[in-house]
């Protein structure tokens, strides 16, 4: 395998890990889930589309649409083609939001999350270019809103997963993740990413504290992802630490 192709695979792997670490926390905040969630997402999207058709396009509606498409891709669809199309729709709505207001931090973050998730499903083509574009939008989101917990988490995840030659830095990763947690600790995936980094560094005691934070959180953001992904992962990592 050529060095260029190896680099491409590494980049798309990093892209995938980064997007998997955030995409379940990039959409609409369903603090209290409808009984038929995630099927209810299609109903929400239809209502939003009807409002846009009858009342016109507005910034908040584009943001809401991007968030809904991300949730549909993450939580409802199972087939990769459907997921990719939903991610692309989310990216397009976020792009249109940025055309209306470039200084919208959430739109930059949503574009990065959706674009990265869509490209992850396509393969290695243009992986380096896409990764650079994603980092640019995440940086801009943080520049506009230094307390944007999700963007801070995503940047921390990128620094944690990228190799040193491609700009990775465990020190920067830890800094961004701690900033994300300080901004809003109920985004529990930031605790998970930081815990994995601390385990890698042999800092088991600190890692356990963050895993406990995932398990003991009250009213986590995105309870669907927390219940199905974040809590089980924290339990698995904590069990492995305690048995080692």
Predicted regions and their residues:
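N-terminal leader/linker segments that initiate helical-solenoid repeat arrays
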Residues: 23-77
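Structural signature of tandem alpha-helical TPR/SEL1-like repeats
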Residues: 41, 78-92, 125-137, 165-179, ...
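Conserved structural position within tetratricopeptide repeats
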Residues: 50-53, 92, 98-99, 139-143, ...
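Short coil/turn linking the two alpha-helices of tandem helical-hairpin repeats
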Residues: 66, 71-80, 117-126, 158-167, ...
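Alpha-helical adaptor scaffolds
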Residues: 116-117, 129-131, 140, 144-179
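Terminal, low-structured helical/coil segments at or just beyond the last alpha-helical repeat
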Residues: 200, 208-244
């Amino acid at each position: 395998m050529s060095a260029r192709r190896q680099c491409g695979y590494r980049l798309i792997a990093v892209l995938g890990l980064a997007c998997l670490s955030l995409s379940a926390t990039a959409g609409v905040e369903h603090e209290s889930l409808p009984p038929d969630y995630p099927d209810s997402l299609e109903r929400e999207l239809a209502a939003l589309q009807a409002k846009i058709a009858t009342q016109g396009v507005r910034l908040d509606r584009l943001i809401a649409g991007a968030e809904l498409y991300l949730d549909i891709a993450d939580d409802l669809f199972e087939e990769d083609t459907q997921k990719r199309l939903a991610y692309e729709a989310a990216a397009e709505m976020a792009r249109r939001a940025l055309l209306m207001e470039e200084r919208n931090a959430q739109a930059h973050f949503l574009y990065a999350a959706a674009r990265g998730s869509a490209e992850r499903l396509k393969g290695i083509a243009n992986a380096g270019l896409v990764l650079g574009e994603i980092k640019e939008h995440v940086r801009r989101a943080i520049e506009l809103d230094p307390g944007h917990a999700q963007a801070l988490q995503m940047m921390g995840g990128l620094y944690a997963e990228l190799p040193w030659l491609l700009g990775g830095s465990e020190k920067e990763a830890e800094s961004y993740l701690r900033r994300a947690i300080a901004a809003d600790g109920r985004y529990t995936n930031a605790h998970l990413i930081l815990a994995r980094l601390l385990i890698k560094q042999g800092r088991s005691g600190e890692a356990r504290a963050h895993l406990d934070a995932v398990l003991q959180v009250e009213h986590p953001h995105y309870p669907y992802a927390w219940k199905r992904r974040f809590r089980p992962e924290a339990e698995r990592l904590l069990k492995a630490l305690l048995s080692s």
